[in-house]
UniProtKB/Swiss-Prot annotation:
Name recorded for this polypeptide: Putative antiporter subunit mnhB2
Gene Ontology MF term list: antiporter activity
Keyword Membrane: yes
Xref: NCBIfam families: PRK12573.1, PRK12574.1
One example of a Gene Ontology biological process annotation: monoatomic ion transport
Highest taxon above the source species: Bacteria
Entry GO terms, CC: plasma membrane
Subcellular location(s) of the protein: Cell membrane
Organism: Staphylococcus haemolyticus (strain JCSC1435)
Length: 141
């Protein structure tokens, strides 16, 4: 982009914060409401792509300690393990376990394995979408 895109860069900083916050909300709300890992991953991806459009791609990649190719592999492994591990304990494929854990400041928190599965989906979607966009753009904004 040009050096004088002050408005775009300023608005991007605000919009990226909003997108990442909304992505977290959609991810965690997806357990009981519409949303989850896939939609949250798309929202996270759009935040990264917006940063690539507003700023220099190489500067953004240097400032983010994220390798998106490794991110998609880690996400796929997390999802696969979450789906397969219950089989070794005599449960069905993709069996969901849940527990209530007490935290001193938060109180009682409802934790499920589906959240871990959705995290794997989110990481995979972010890794795939951003890798495809970087490949299509040639790593240039």
């Amino acid at each position: 982009m040009k050096e004088n895109d002050v408005v775009l860069r300023t608005v991007t900083k605000i919009v990226v914060f909003i997108l990442l916050t909304f992505g977290f909300y959609v991810f965690f709300a997806g357990h009981n409401n519409p949303g989850g890992g896939f939609i949250g991953g798309l929202i996270f991806s759009s935040a990264f792509i917006l940063m690539f459009l507003a700023f220099d791609v190489h500067e953004v990649l240097e400032s983010l300690p994220i390798d998106f190719k490794k991110l998609m592999i880690v996400g796929a492994i997390i999802s696969a393990l979450t789906a397969i591990v219950p089989v070794f304990f005599g449960k069905s494929f993709l069996y969901q376990s849940e527990a209530y854990i007490h935290f001193p400041l938060l109180g009682e928190l409802h934790v499920t394995t589906i959240t871990l599965f959705e995290l794997g989906i989110l990481l995979t979607v972010v890794g795939v979408i951003v890798t495809i966009m970087l490949a299509l753009s040639g790593g240039k904004s």
